[in-house]
């Protein structure tokens, strides 16, 4: 019986918070603050211990990681758009190196301890929307559901 009352209290609280939460999460400032909080936690608990190793401190390693990220990103995107006609729906497989390259570049920027800005977040949302659009059916046709272009365009309009 005690478990049922706890669940009903949890559901009541959730129903009270949900309408305000939906509105707040659409605010770009809240999104950027949340991202910076997550990046801060990752920096303290994951990145700083790795960063203290000698190999990661070397300049050659840092330059190699940046170059590798750029090469993977450009090669993946180029192959996706060049070979999409021949491969059909399987062309999205070439996005895997592009996504790995993007993650590598984002991780490199975290290593350089630069905070996320609204401009970077808009660019990231636009890239994620395009990636999702290609991954869902192999075509750019605005069929994405998670990262929609409407949300990134509305934040662009609000920022202007």
From Swiss-Prot:
Major localization class:
membrane
Q: How does it sit in the membrane?
A: Multi-pass membrane protein
Keyword annotations of the record = Membrane, Transmembrane, Transmembrane helix
- Segments crossing the lipid bilayer: 63-83, 92-112
Annotated localization: Membrane
**Pfam families for this protein:** CRPA
UniProt superkingdom: Bacteria
- GO CC list: outer membrane
Protein name per its UniProtKB record: Sulfur-rich protein
